[in-house]
Structure formats: structure tokens, C-alpha cells
């Protein structure tokens, strides 16, 4: 009997061990992979997907009409190693009948932990304090030296009370937060009850919060949501944290708000673009802490994500139910 033709799978970069092992054990697939941790150049990506039945990509890989055309009619499954899907041309993908897998849920805890870490790092001015120790600035003591802001008796505003937003609130509550506010597309009374969180207009959230954490999805409605008008409503003692997507924030307006003292400080795990150029004005500010999009970066989480992404891909190729399929 003639052996069945193998299905071509293209992977846009090295995977953690669990996902790599799942693909290696797939006897019905022929796996090709870009073997560098650096982002795959566009030309190599377009060449790599030619004739592929499945594509396993990253958040940094733009899957648009041109790439889909390059892949051709064989492409039936795209699995992304992310919960975000704003890098995927979903309308075009749906038009072609291609299934999409993603990795929600598994990164919630790690991302919430990072959000709280970033908030504490920013509000207590830890990078500044570390630098003072290193450069000899720790020469004496005075009552207000290196003072920051505490969470006890504070008001925390969360933009987007989804899985990650709830996990952040759950971790902040034991710090003695007095009041939680949230905003989003619609009230979520069942989820909000755990924190006695109040659903309010975004202008009220900006004006009344001591700490603001942005954890919403990037959509046409949230693009540029946090801009000049938003920052002008914030307290000058307020801390702004973004762990969602860079495009939710107008970074020029944020820079002006920070540089002028309109708001106290900001912590960002996401920027536009990524990576952020070392010459970017935000990096000149002591009151702005920027991380390289490491929200889900724990060994356990990344391994779990890679296994889920691999299983999504394989199930889709075999015509089976995906563990986590995006409904288009």
C-alpha cells in the first residue's frame, strides 16, 4: 500500500520542550522550523509557508492576506502561541475556511503575577532605588527619600475584567485595597462580586483610581483608548500599568503626562513597536518602567502554551476538535 502523504507543518521558531515533543511524535506530519530565537524575516516566512497544511506562529508573526496567498490552498490550520490574535487577519482567514487555535487560560496566572510585580516595582520606585545603591546615591537617609505609593486603602481601576483582570484583582485584594473599579464592554456582576468591584464609565475610573491596570483585549474600540484625555483625568499621584497591548495606549500622550508630572509613574510590559527602540523618549524617564513583554514568561507557562499550541495544530489537521479553538 502506498504510504499516506505527510502533512507539512511550518513552525516560525523554536518551541519549548513539551510542544516540540508533541510535534516530533506526529507521524502524519513533516515539520519544518525556523531555528532561531530571533524573529523570522518576512521573506523566509513567506517561503516557509508555501504548501503548508499547518502553521504554528508567534504573536510577532503577521499573518495577513499576502502570507495566506503565499501558503496556498493547502493551509487549513493556524495555531498561535499566544492568547492575543491581533496579528492574524481573521476576516481573511475565515473567508478561506482556515481554523485557528490559540492559548487562552494557561497564561492567566503568570501574566497576573507579572502585572502585580510591575505595579509594585513602579509604585515603590524599585529601579530608581537599585540605581541609587549602584551609583553611590545611598549616602544618607531622609524621611522622603525614595518614597513611593502604597496599595493599602487605595482605589484600583481595572480596564478589562476578563480572566487576567480578575486574577490581578484577586492578587491585589490582600494588600488592603479599599475599592475596585472596572470598565469594559458591559458589566460583569458575577465576576465582579468577588471583589465588590464597581462598573463605571472609563472617565470616572481614570479620575478616581490611585492605580490603573489595563488588561483588555486590543480591538477597534480599545485602540488608543488611553490617550491625552484619559491621562488628564487621572490624579497626579496615580500609577498607570499596561499589560494588554501597546496600541491601547497613545505613547506620545503618555510621555507628556509622565514628563510633565500629570501622573506619577507608569509601568509597561507592552509597547508599540516591540521591541521598543533604545532611543525612545519613554526610556529617558525615571518614572517609567518598561519590560520586554514577559507577562507569560515562566518555564511552566511557556511549556504549557507550546503543548497546547501543538495539540491545537495537530487536532485541526486531523479534523478533530481543538483543545482551544478561536470561534471565527
From Swiss-Prot:
PROSITE patterns according to UniProt: D_2_HYDROXYACID_DH_3 (PS00671)
Q: Native species of this protein?
A: Mus musculus
Any one GO BP annotation for this protein: dicarboxylic acid metabolic process
Residues at the active site? 293 (proton donor)
* InterPro entries membership: D-isomer_2-hydroxyacid_DH, D-isomer_2_OHA_DH_cat_dom, D-isomer_DH_CS, D-isomer_DH_NAD-bd, NAD(P)-bd_dom_sf
- What's the protein called, per UniProt? Glyoxylate reductase/hydroxypyruvate reductase
Described function: Enzyme with hydroxy-pyruvate reductase, glyoxylate reductase and D-glycerate dehydrogenase enzymatic activities. Reduces hydroxypyruvate to D-glycerate, glyoxylate to glycolate oxidizes D-glycerate to hydroxypyruvate.
- What GO CC annotations are associated with the protein? catalytic complex; cytoplasm
Residues with site note (Raises pKa of active site His): 274
Q: Which residues carry this modification: Phosphothreonine?
A: 298
Query: Tell me, how does this one assemble?
Result: Homodimer.
User: Can you tell which superkingdom this protein's organism belongs to?
Assistant: Eukaryota
* One Pfam family of this chain: 2-Hacid_dh
Q: Which reaction does it catalyse?
A: glycolate + NADP(+) = glyoxylate + NADPH + H(+); (R)-glycerate + NAD(+) = 3-hydroxypyruvate + NADH + H(+); (R)-glycerate + NADP(+) = 3-hydroxypyruvate + NADPH + H(+)
- Residues annotated as carrying Phosphoserine in the record are 36
Its taxonomic placement starts with: Eukaryota, Metazoa, Chordata, Craniata, Vertebrata
State the similarity comment. Belongs to the D-isomer specific 2-hydroxyacid dehydrogenase family.
Amino acid at each position: 500500500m502506498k504510504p499516506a502523504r505527510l502533512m507539512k507543518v511550518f513552525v516560525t521558531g523554536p518551541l519549548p520542550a513539551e510542544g516540540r515533543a508533541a510535534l516530533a511524535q506526529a507521524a502524519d506530519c513533516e515539520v519544518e522550523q525556523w531555528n532561531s530565537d530571533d524573529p523570522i524575516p518576512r521573506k523566509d516566512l513567506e517561503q516557509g509557508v508555501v504548501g503548508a497544511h499547518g502553521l504554528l506562529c508567534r504573536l510577532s508573526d503577521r499573518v495577513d492576506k499576502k502570507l495566506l496567498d503565499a501558503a496556498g490552498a493547502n493551509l487549513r490550520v493556524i495555531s498561535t502561541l499566544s492568547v492575543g490574535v491581533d496579528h492574524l487577519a481573521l476576516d481573511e482567514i475565515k473567508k478561506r475556511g482556515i481554523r485557528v487555535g490559540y492559548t487562552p487560560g494557561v497564561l492567566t496566572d503568570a501574566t497576573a503575577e507579572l502585572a502585580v510585580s510591575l505595579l509594585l516595582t513602579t509604585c515603590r520606585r524599585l529601579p530608581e532605588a537599585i540605581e541609587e545603591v549602584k551609583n553611590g546615591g545611598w549616602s544618607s537617609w531622609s524621611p522622603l527619600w525614595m518614597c513611593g505609593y502604597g496599595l493599602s486603602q487605595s482605589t484600583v481601576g481595572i480596564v478589562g475584567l476578563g480572566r487576567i483582570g480578575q486574577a490581578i484583582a484577586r492578587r491585589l485584594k490582600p494588600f488592603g485595597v479599599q475599592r475596585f473599579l472596572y470598565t469594559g464592554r458591559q458589566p460583569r456582576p458575577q465576576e465582579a462580586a468577588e471583589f465588590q468591584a464597581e462598573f463605571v464609565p472609563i472617565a470616572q475610573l481614570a479620575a478616581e483610581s490611585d492605580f490603573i491596570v489595563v488588561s483588555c483585549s486590543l480591538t477597534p474600540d480599545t485602540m488608543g483608548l488611553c490617550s491625552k484625555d484619559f491621562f488628564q483625568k487621572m490624579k497626579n499621584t496615580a500609577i498607570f500599568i499596561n499589560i494588554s497591548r501597546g496600541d491601547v495606549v497613545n505613547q506620545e500622550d503618555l510621555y507628556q503626562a509622565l514628563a510633565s508630572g500629570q501622573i506619577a509613574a507608569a509601568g509597561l510590559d507592552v509597547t508599540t513597536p516591540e521591541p521598543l527602540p533604545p532611543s525612545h523618549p519613554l526610556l529617558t524617564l525615571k518614572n517609567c518602567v518598561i519590560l520586554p513583554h514577559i507577562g507569560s514568561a515562566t518555564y511552566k507557562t511557556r511549556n504549557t502554551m507550546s503543548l497546547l499550541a501543538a495539540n491545537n495544530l495537530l487536532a485541526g489537521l486531523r479534523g478533530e476538535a481543538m483543545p482551544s479553538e478561536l470561534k471565527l
